[in-house]
């Protein structure tokens, strides 16, 4: 098919995102160009100057006769000339050292793509070639294909069209000058595109004839659609030819010519651009993730066991974030029925107490007494004459105000929530990361604790006391020497002190007002420093297995030593080893009465018959430790001598101190401590319990997870990791039972249809089904999701009913119904496993041992061996905490 065509070269050709040249309609075209005919998204360099035809006149559009279809011969070049290589435009955002002009789509893809998401033009004003007179290009030879840029001025043509399908012979592959940024353009030389014209600076010289390219050397079916378009107004240049490339291995490609002045064309183009933009964004995100992965400090792959005390060489951070200043609400505080006007500081403290009115804390006398003492300390002498008793204080109005604010917060719009999330993310990006030795690390607790009332754990004697507001003048920063000191975020305040101590890992610290203890800003658990400490801890515990036998022989031998001190040391070590007790420290009168092994009193132990003892005391966090256990006979006899003649409040190990015990442990093995004993016993217990799994009994993933949790439960019991049963446990169990009953009803409905269950049961099933639908509707209305906020109750009811009926629709085929029955059986089993797990673990906390005492490599090896996804056992935070735990299936603690 011979194609004759007049083409006016536009003054500037923009990028076309890698679209390949395609055969245009068989037309003879004359263009008229002015400033109003450009695409909004493809503005020319000088939009206020009009373009004229070469001779300054306007030519009429002349349709060409309809030619007979012919088969063009493939050509790799035009008139024997090779394609003109593209010159890379000057781009300040591109890599300055890139010398290959054909690689700009690779080196600058992130910059050009981001620009093109909002506009097709990615060049700055300085990159735009000067306008040149438009000259006529000679007609191309038969079989060649011309191409117009997407950003060229529009041309409206009156065309006589034909549709021809041809099969081209294989042509030599042409090396791409630029790879497209589209997803479909990376794997074919067809997409090498004559885009070189869009970046070429040759327009500043003499316009050159554009070489045509044929598709790659594969057999293709090319369908060329030619359409007739007519207009009586301005005649824009025809839009870019779109190439829709098949992603499969087929060699068929469809080339469409877009209509030039169709009313819906702009919408189509916008949609396509949006789709391309989304693809680009996804691609950029993937590349970003890869770059982030490449930037991860895989310190665990480096052999560096030396420890000279230096924790870091360079340290940069922006300091902690302080809570916002208090904003007074002006809600009245009542005393004995009368209003007492409060200052902002007094009102703030009163609001702290009002926040706990509906909790168990206000039921504790110590909480109320301590608060009232703090509150009275803020009152003036005149106010103290009025406010004398806590029982007459009325905080209910403030409490109502707080509840209203809470409801308002829940009712926030999606836009408000998004804005708040964006603000938090902005703060996190600034303060939530530190740069250590060139690596970006997360900061754990970068928020300064806000003021409030101290709660404490268990029966803490200081519960209810006021936690004062922390200011920058209370905070000491630790930062690299010579680094920029972050400014104080509160005007008029200065940091207490700036230090450069590279032998510690904290970033900031201050002293809290209640107990006088220090609070620190640490790096996150996923950081290198924390990870190294964790791995070292587990390696030390793992090494204990090599000498645990000798240590045990040593303390067992000392049970009968003449020295009381040695006998007490031996029995204490035995209890720490056998029962995984904490070492225990002496506590002051103003601290909670929690004890460990060395601080046990006679009242905490009861000697039963048959070498059995019962220990009953408050452990860490005031959690009760109650355990009746049979011990060694020789240890039992020695304990009897320790108890004899002592009062209940006397120490059981009165000749032993924590320092003596720790010093003895260090002599047994480097790094050994009571905590190492707990870590060793916890990890070895998990290892032994997991090794007991019968793969025939536990086959599904859910069954294996239940088995793992049971093993973890044994460790939690050993370490006394308890928790109070959830308050809504009964409700949760009831919901699981209802779900199981529903699944069984659905099974029976399937069986009734195939005649496996008597229809007499159908009435009971339908009765329960009738009760379920209203409940589901009410639940959906009560718990509206953000996407359903605009829907009426009637619309939600309709949607729920439709979904309910759809879920109850049964197929006609008997085989399909049997498949449904089997599927329901799997779901029933899953719910039963869930119920069993919740019941068994209702008073046991599994998380504490996973975080602190269980070598994560044991779990990873077990998961790999039994084909259980690690994320079913470890949360994301735990996976981030233990990146070094990726081991093979043969790992043994």
From Swiss-Prot:
Catalyzed reaction equations: ATP-independent breakage of single-stranded DNA, followed by passage and rejoining
Topo IB-type catalytic domain segment(s): 526-893
Short name of any one Pfam family annotated for the protein: Topoisom_I_N
Major enzyme class: isomerase
Subcellular location: Nucleus
Biased segments, Basic residues type: 208-217, 271-281
GO molecular function, one term: DNA topoisomerase type I (single strand cut, ATP-independent) activity
GO BP, one annotated term: chromosome segregation
Functional description taken from the UniProt entry: Releases the supercoiling and torsional tension of DNA introduced during the DNA replication and transcription by transiently cleaving and rejoining one strand of the DNA duplex. Introduces a single-strand break via transesterification at a target site in duplex DNA. The scissile phosphodiester is attacked by the catalytic tyrosine of the enzyme, resulting in the formation of a DNA-(3'-phosphotyrosyl)-enzyme intermediate and the expulsion of a 5'-OH DNA strand. TThe free DNA strand then rotates around the intact phosphodiester bond on the opposing strand, thus removing DNA supercoils.
Additional remarks: Eukaryotic topoisomerase I and II can relax both negative and positive supercoils, whereas prokaryotic enzymes relax only negative supercoils.
UniProt protein name: DNA topoisomerase 1
